[in-house]
A protein has these predicted regions:
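Generic C-terminal helix-cap and adjacent flexible tail
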Residues: 2-4, 144-148
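Short coil/turn motifs at secondary-structure junctions
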Residues: 68-70, 88, 121-123, 146
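Conserved GNAT acetyl-CoA-binding A-motif
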Residues: 99, 106-118
């Protein structure tokens, strides 16, 4: 069953409904903390946050997209920085709709590729992205940047 949603660009006023979604992804945050982050992100032309709302106007998904130049390609790279679907809406096509919109935005921005990383333990996410045509190409390593 596909859930009919409206996908639109988020604003900082959406922080109260986006914060719980980030919590479901494993990043607990409240609107007071999230809003300033969104202000910084949305002030940039290369950052977009999409929100999916169901027919009642409830937020059921979010996607953060970053478009940037890289040395390896002539054209920019677009990266999905976050994708989360509310537990009640998973498996209903909301994620696919958000990724399709991100793909459209990436093309409009002139990007040559759409990329995403997921945690090694998220086998369900790996399968989801592969169903959408993404291919596994490598590993991601992360370390904290220490303040001096």
């Amino acid at each position: 069953m596909t859930t009919r949603v409206t996908v639109r660009e988020a604003t900082t006023a959406d922080a109260p409904v986006l914060a719980p979604l980030l919590g479901e992804l494993g990043y607990p945050v409240n609107a007071k903390v999230l809003a300033p982050r969104m202000v910084r992100m949305l002030a940039r032309d290369d950052e977009k946050i999409l929100i999916a709302e169901d027919e009642q106007g409830a937020a059921v998904g979010l996607l953060a997209l970053h478009v940037f130049p890289v040395l390896a390609y002539d054209r920019d790279l677009a990266m999905i920085m976050a994708l989360v679907i509310s537990e009640r809406a998973r498996g209903t096509g909301v994620g696919r709709q958000l990724v399709e919109r991100a793909d459209q935005m990436a093309r409009e921005a002139g990007a040559s590729r759409l990329m995403v990383t997921t945690h090694v333990r998220r086998a369900d996410a790996h399968a989801f992205y592969e169903r959408l045509g993404f291919e596994f190409t490598g590993r991601r390593y992360v370390r904290a940047v220490e303040e001096e």
